[in-house]
Regions:
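SDR active-site strand-loop-helix element
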Residues: 28-29, 65-71, 101-103
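Short amphipathic alpha-helical segments at helix-loop
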Residues: 34-38, 71-72, 130-133
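Hydrophobic, well-structured mid-protein blocks that either form specific transmembrane helices
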Residues: 41-90
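NAD(P)H-binding glycine-rich loop region in Rossmannoid oxidoreductase-like domains
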Residues: 1-52, 56-59
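Active-site proximal helix/loop that lines the substrate pocket
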Residues: 30-33, 70-73, 108
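Oxidoreductase cofactor-interface core, primarily capturing Rossmann-like NAD(P)-dependent enzymes
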Residues: 60, 75-176
Length: 181
């Protein structure tokens, strides 16, 4: 069973000290409810945290880094996309094996407004001229994300692995039933 480190601090020293016994570092830190109006927060929170985390994980000898990124390319949220892309570059530069998980939007508690759009996504995934974009920018559930993160931790890659929306949807792993997810 891999040893996993979950932290929510910006302290490189704290992260480095706690990372020594971990096999996998999972980075989930980011601004809540992203919107184009939060560009400065993306740089102050998301970018700073990934800089600290990537360096600390490398220095601590962690073997696998899991980074929650975002679907790329995407037509909106340019600052968010830019920060996440830069975060991926920082993780790649460490030389660690890495998994970049790239959802577009995660449906779950408090994030249900896009459900009425599901029929439009279904149609767009079937039309040849919109299929690729609709699949890359599709909606995933919190349950699919949890399955993907757990699977990523339990199956570290040799090198870099990118899991986009199609891969997130296809991840199979049994999870206990929980109606809240």
């Amino acid at each position: 069973v891999p040893k996993v480190l979950l932290v929510s601090r910006f302290s490189w020293i704290l992260i480095r000290r706690r990372s020594h016994s971990a096999d996998t570092f999972v980075h989930l830190i980011g601004v809540t409810h992203p919107s184009p109006a939060k560009a400065a927060q993306f740089r102050a929170v998301d970018l700073v945290s990934i800089k600290v985390a990537a360096k600390a994980a490398r220095d601590a000898g962690v073997r696998h880094f899991v980074y929650l990124s975002v679907a790329q390319p995407a037509p909106v949220m340019k600052a968010f996309l830019e920060v996440r892309r830069h975060g991926e570059e920082l993780v790649r530069a460490t030389g660690l094996s890495a998994t970049f998980v790239r959802p577009c939007y995660v449906l779950g508690l408090g994030h249900r407004w896009p459900y009425p759009l599901l029929p439009f996504y279904w149609l767009a995934e079937r039309l040849p001229w919109t299929r690729e974009s609709a699949r890359r920018l599709g909606l995933v559930t919190i349950r699919q994300m949890i399955r993907t993160l757990v699977w990523s931790i339990e199956n570290p890659p040799n090198g870099v692995r990118i899991l986009g929306v199609p891969e997130i949807r296809a991840t199979t792993l049994s999870l206990p039933q929980n109606d809240r997810l």
